[in-house]
Regions:
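Residue-level signature of catalytic and energy-coupling elements of molecular machines
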Residues: 9-11, 25, 33, 46, ...
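Conserved Switch II/interswitch segment of TRAFAC-class P-loop GTPases
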Residues: 5-7, 12-19, 26-50, 54-76
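Alpha-helical scaffold elements adjacent to nucleotide-binding pockets in ATP/GTP-utilizing enzyme cores
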Residues: 21-24, 28, 45-52, 76-84, ...
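P-loop NTPase nucleotide-binding/switch module
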Residues: 1-24, 86-90, 95, 102-107, ...
Length: 374
């Protein structure tokens, strides 16, 4: 909350394993903060997410952070940001985006690198004045796209999304539909409604068009479903959740060192934890393999490795197999997943990239110069 405004700030992942998630989150917002380190400059993931934001026509505010670093090179980083916007074919308005200079650790922001800020008011003022308010008729029939899910032991699965139009209320009867599955039709009820306040959630009675809210009461709600007023069922388009591409087997640790590191070592502990993860991660697939082993399929190595590390830190002890690529039989042929990779590199790096992709059975489909890069 800032003055008379409520500002929703949503973070996005940058890794390709979560590419669909980036696009779903960007559809919930009206503008973006392009956060750039004053020493490191724009990173590869910065380019990936910014390109998606520009394609959606979002307004951009450039924020150069960590200006208090000893190795800060603010002027050079600003030039790199402008080159990035130019390379990504930004519109004239996006190219003239306002720029702020911050130190998040000190909680200060200023309009010039030569000024020393006092607080973050310049950043919030720029957001209020430059980013458009969400559009949507609060009197129209309610419509909301579920862009993310969460899970709570007390209320079960929680849907998160932005109200596109109308007003959503507690105890409201709703229809649930799916853009990619016209045959899916169900009814539900909003049992509880929450607004986001900082990192927490506060219960509310109703929310209007443009609000980002969380709701509970529908056990099988998932990403991509549209919640509508029953009198006007109209699904919203969304980016489909990617199918799993690799699989690993999680099993009980039966090595000579079993039971020495973790607190939770039995197959029942492992099963319960994986079932809990399925409630909040819709792109994970788990199948039982005998009594002590589980096949866990995900979107990529990073996706599964994050789960493994999280469970290890929680005190679970288990062993994992090497990753296996998942294949599909399409029209009688066995097909393996492929990744369409777009590398944006300086001319000097082209040879190294082509060589490394060749080792992974990569086929070069096209090579186009964009400015001084390929």
């Amino acid at each position: 909350h800032y003055k008379d405004y409520k500002i929703n700030i949503v973070d996005t992942p940058g890794h390709a394993d979560f590419g669909g998630e980036v696009e779903r989150i960007l559809k919930m917002v009206n503008g973006v903060l392009l956060l750039v380190d004053a020493a490191e400059g724009p990173m590869p993931q910065t380019r990936f997410v910014l390109q998606k934001a520009l394609e959606l026509g979002h307004k951009v505010i450039v924020v150069v952070n960590k200006i208090d670093r000893l190795d800060a090179r603010v002027e050079e980083v600003m030039d790199e940001v402008l080159e990035l916007l130019l390379d990504l074919n930004a519109t004239d308005e996006q190219f003239e985006s306002p720029t702020l200079f911050c130190s998040a650790r000190q909680g200060i922001a200023s309009y010039s690198p030569n000024e020393t800020g006092v607080n973050l008011d310049p950043l919030f003022d720029t957001i209020v004045n430059y980013i458009p308010a969400p559009e949507g008729d609060p009197t129209a029939p309610m419509q909301m796209l579920v862009s993310s899910i969460d899970y709570n032991d007390y209320v079960g699965r929680i849907g998160i999304g932005r109200v596109e139009r109308g007003t959503v209320r507690v105890n409201q009867e709703v229809a649930i539909c799916d853009y990619h599955d016209p045959s899916h039709s169900a009814k539900g009820k909003i049992v509880a409604l929450y607004e986001f306040d900082g990192l927490g959630k506060n219960p509310i009675q109703e929310a209007g068009a443009g609000e980002i809210v969380a709701f509970s009461g529908m056990a099988d709600i998932t990403i991509g479903r549209t919640i509508c007023a029953p009198e006007q069922v109209e699904p919203l388009p969304f980016v489909k959740i990617s199918d799993p591409t690799i699989e690993m087997t999680f099993s009980v640790n039966d090595s000579p060192f079993a039971g020495k590191e973790g607190k939770y070592v039995t197959s029942r502990n492992l099963r319960d934890r994986l079932q809990r993860e399925l409630l909040k991660d819709v792109s994970l697939h788990v199948t039982e393999q005998g009594t002590d082993a589980f096949n866990v399929a995900g979107r990529g190595e990073m996706h599964i490795s994050i789960l493994i590390e999280t469970m290890r830190r929680e005190g679970y002890e288990f062993q994992v197999s090497t990753p296996r690529v998942l294949t599909k039989v399409i029209d009688g042929k066995v097909c393996e997943p492929i990744e369409r990779m777009v590398a944006d590199v300086p001319e000097a790096s082209m040879g190294s990239v082509i060589e490394k992709m060749g080792r992974r059975k990569g086929d070069l489909l096209s090579m186009n110069p964009v400015g001084s890069r390929y």
